[in-house]
Amino acid sequence: MNIIADEIKLKQDVVTYRVCEKLKEFTLDSSAVLYYNFPLYRGELPEDLIQAQLLLASPQYGILYFKCLESNRYLTKEEEIYLDDLDVSIINRLNKRSELRKGRRELKFNVTLLIISEKDEIIDDRKYVSLPCLKKAIEANKDAALTDEEFNILLSCIDGTSRLTTKKERKISLDNESKLKADVLNRIQNKEAAFDLEQKKVALVTIDGPQRIRGLAGSGKTIILTMKAALYHMAHPNEDILYTYYTKSLFGLIKNLIERFYRDFADNREPNWKKIHILHGWGGVELGGVYSTACMENGIEPITYNIARQFSSNPFDYVCKSILGTGKIAPKYDLTLIDEGQDFPDHFYQLCYALSKEKRIVWAYDDFQNIFDINLQDEKNTFGKDQKGDYLVDFSKNNNPLQDIVLHTCYRNPRTALIAAFSLGLGIYNSKVLQRLEDNNHWELLGFKVESGHSDVGDQMVISRPIEHTPNIMNQELGIYTIKVSSFSDYASECKFVTQCITQDIQDEKLRPDDICVICLDNRNINAYYSLLSRMLIRNGISTFNLVDAPNANKHFFYENNVTLSTINKAKGNEAGMVYIIGADTVFINRDNVILRNKLFTAITRTKGWVTITGGEKIKYCLEELNKLEENDFKLVFTQPSKETTKTVESGSKVQQNLLLDVQSKIDILVNSGLSVEDIMQFIQRKK
């Protein structure tokens, strides 16, 4: 039996904790789930909350929910009405799924209320049960066992994940074994979505204090944060929630998920958006942000980007540090949720902390978003110290197991695509390994299995990805060959090939245009690439949504019936069924550059299905590395390098990055003086 609860709060609830401990003594199914203070539903008024004290879901014993009385008494009239409403809410949700019914109305399992008391009696069909007789009462609820699929559907109804999957309308064949891309994506999206145990523990429970959620791209971090926002708003409709994020195009997804989850629990009512503040990190005139809003509400003059970059190579960190230095920040938010935490500087965390009333702050963090930044985030340094010199956040001082959760399963990427992304990102099959993880534990935190080696320098390492860390449906439907690589002599040939592939995807494979995303890794020629590609596609009747040309305040990544053309930065946090990565030869011109490798890693991990990588002659090195990966049965086999050899690469990349920032600053000054970008490029060409 698995327990979903804040154990600290549960232990403080003495009566309920005693019942929970008694249930642990029984031999229930290993897949059974016991929820504490969940599920919860909205009553007639926003202030009315209907909540189960304890609810047990089991494939053998059905559903039992408990009212734990603190003394030898009967239910009050108000409690009877409350429990009747809860009963109706639970049964109505379950009855919506035909898979859980036998006939038109009757469920395949029993839904039973047990009132835990010192008595053993039935009054008005209400069963009062003492702890010594609890096992017998549970046994009486036993019925024909549910199948794994049926129980999965039952849990999705309880958890609120039944609305999780976005259903896209695609033309489908009648052949259930069809391998058309549209049919494969349909079968994957129609598979019942349900939280795994790790996700349940963090999504359905909000602890009183800081909490970090770690996991790879596609492990469900955004889904968990949006569920937290919806449930907290259900329970505390008059309190303010901050949800902040880094990638502007995530706004639409975040708002949509919060609304879907809230409507599911609140009988299709809309959340009060005046209490849920979805704000970009920085913000500006056209886009609300945490920094810009904090300045406005606290009477502080905001610092513009152009001014901030004159004082720091990290302008956003500079403005956050500056506003904190004013000492004027007034706490506003009762719950703060930070998405894409790996992209934010420390002073932004400290600003969010200052804006949080009860320091109830939750952040999602991708340990591997930056290939060359493999050190785990230190929460103590991230949030800093108070005036006494004590760390504001220190996980070592709190024994709550929910304060730092790691999600091991990746739900977005096919297994081999994720392994390929790691292989290319780390340079495992490059002429030399470019980056290393410090120890075996770090590999395991990322959901891998260390088959050989201890991560000591010179060790022969063999790393695999357990098949159970990818949903079975994806393994079954997609197989192992999800990545293709093609080389071309010029841009025109490359764009023509990609146009033909996209046209075939839409016409023959029956994909929607908005199932497809193109990511260009050649920043220097991205405008030329997308201009040519757009013209070629429109000749075939295919429209594009070019994010390079989108206004700065754009909040969307997809536009219906358009193929998305994106930069790597704007693609972060988003996903697509079919991903084309063009201009990828630029990554292999300097094969040891980990910053460029990081871009390729991020691009590959946008896919829910297939990836096609294209580029010039140097793309052959990408193909060579992928062939070696396949020869090793999609395992990472390498000799553990020393810290010094990998640090050399890291330092070189950072030097290059700082030089590029300096060049960018000088270009901006020239543009502001009246020169055009074309004038500057012509000058550079003459100097070659």
Question: Which ranges hold each PLM region?
Answer:
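Conserved helicase motor core of SF1/SF2 NTP-dependent helicases
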Residues: E192, R212-L242, Y246-W273, G281-V285, ...
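Conserved P-loop NTPase-based nucleic-acid remodeling module centered on helicase motor cores
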Residues: P46, S58-N95, E106-K108, I122-P132, ...
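Short, solvent-exposed polar/charged micro-motifs at secondary-structure junctions
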Residues: R42-E47, D120-R126, V285-T293, R415-T416, ...
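Pre-Walker A segment
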Residues: L131-A217, T226-H236
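Generic hydrophobic alpha-helical segments
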Residues: V19, L23, Q199-V202, A229, ...
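Extended, charge-rich low-complexity interaction segments
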Residues: N141-L154, I300-G327, E575-N590, E644-E650
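Accessory nucleic-acid engagement/destabilization modules that flank
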Residues: M1-L174
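Conserved helicase NTPase motor core
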Residues: K179-R214, I278-G281, V285-E286, V290-T382, ...
